[in-house]
């Protein structure tokens, strides 16, 4: 939501049960721990990694500048841009979109697009049971991960 405030566009694909290797290969390997600072640095305008999607596997950003299939769903609003169409097009994963034009956050899940969502809705969807993202045989705790990202945004007491 910090990126939305400054209208920095983003396309964040959260890998679920289906491994997204074919899309990962279209981008640049990152293999960095998922933090708000990493996301801000990747999607900063006029930087080499800002175009395309990132793929999140477990608690890591595995690749950036990835190409995704665009949805050809004619029911989608004509005012939606490429990021939103790509988010709906990759139905194998949950995808978070930050609009560069409006700063609004949307979420695509299983071909459905939830537009202009608030932080609570996003947290709820990320913590629901259908996100069975497994890393090293363990269920990823999305609530804990969201708390860690939030803590990374807070200034330290040092």
Mark where each language-model region is.
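Divalent-cation
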Residues: 1-158
């Amino acid at each position: 939501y910090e990126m939305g405030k400054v209208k920095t566009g983003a396309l964040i694909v959260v890998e679920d049960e289906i491994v997204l290797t074919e899309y990962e290969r279209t981008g640049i390997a990152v293999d960095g721990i998922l933090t708000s600072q990493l996301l801000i640095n990747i999607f900063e305008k006029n930087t080499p990694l800002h175009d395309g999607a990132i793929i999140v596997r477990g608690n890591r950003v595995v690749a950036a500048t990835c190409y995704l299939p665009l949805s050809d769903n004619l029911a989608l609003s004509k005012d939606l841009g490429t990021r939103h169409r790509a988010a709906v097009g990759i139905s194998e994963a949950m995808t978070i979109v930050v609009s560069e034009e409006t700063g609004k956050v949307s979420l695509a899940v299983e071909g459905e697009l939830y537009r202009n969502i608030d932080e609570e809705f996003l947290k709820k969807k990320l913590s629901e049971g259908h996100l069975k993202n497994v890393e090293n045989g363990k269920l990823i705790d999305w609530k804990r991960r969201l708390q860690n990202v939030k803590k990374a945004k807070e200034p330290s007491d040092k």
